[in-house]
Amino acid sequence: MSYNQKFLSHLQNFWINHEIKRFSWALGRIIEELPNFQVFQVIPNHEDEPWVYVSSGIGQFLGQEFFIISPFETPEHIETLAMLASASMHYPDQFQLGKTINIGRPWVEQSSFQHFLISLPYPYGQELEYMDNVRFFWLLPITQPERLFLNTHSVEDLETRFDERGIDYLDINRPSVI
């Protein structure tokens, strides 16, 4: 069984009864770096469920994959995951749990958030987090003040503030917790 087939099986076991689509990205250096790279899109069954986009291909090399949770469908997330997968192959130390990533543009149109925090998959737990020796990390959109807060505070301090405020991570312009 190929990595992507095993990967899809892991997603199907987690998101039972959800349609899951597979996408490739054919632009840029990722074609040479990760020729089997794909993004899987988990389609919500209900209006109140998010869209989920999951990278597939870097886990074979770095032992981790990333996912984005979105309030709506957009191909931007496929491009973002391809861009980050490529960058992670060149700068693996910058793509570890607790690090932040500046993606250079809003994570979705009409949002002011241009940074992701590489986080544990809190909305889904350990059942999704592990597939053999591969871990799944959540790319949580954060505000610029939240990113700057991490210069002097721990990720746990920021996560405590998220918990205390009960952030709506699907609100593309949620208030900063800082």
Residue map of PLM features:
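Acidic, proline/glycine-rich low-complexity IDRs
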Residues: 1-178
